């Protein structure tokens, strides 16, 4: 039904947003620190 399809689409979008958010956080952490070393002391 249309309702089920709508909820499926919303769920998929929610997962995509959550995944993107997690990826962005991971990327930021990688930028801010290299192997646990603060960016200020990294090369």
Swiss-Prot record:
UniProt KW Secreted keyword: yes
Signal peptide stretch: none
Chief location bin: secreted
UniProt subcellular location: Secreted, Cell wall, S-layer
Keyword field: Cell wall, Repeat, S-layer, Secreted
Gene Ontology cellular-component terms listed: extracellular region; S-layer; spore wall
Domain of life: Bacteria
Function: The S-layer is a paracrystalline mono-layered assembly of proteins which coat the surface of bacteria.
Name of protein: S-layer protein 1
Record lineage: Bacteria, Bacillati, Bacillota, Bacilli, Bacillales
């Amino acid at each position: 039904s249309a309702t089920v399809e709508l909820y499926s689409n919303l769920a998929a979008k929610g997962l995509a947003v959550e995944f993107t958010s997690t990826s962005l956080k991971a990327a930021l952490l990688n930028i801010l620190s290299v192997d646990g070393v603060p960016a200020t002391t990294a090369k």
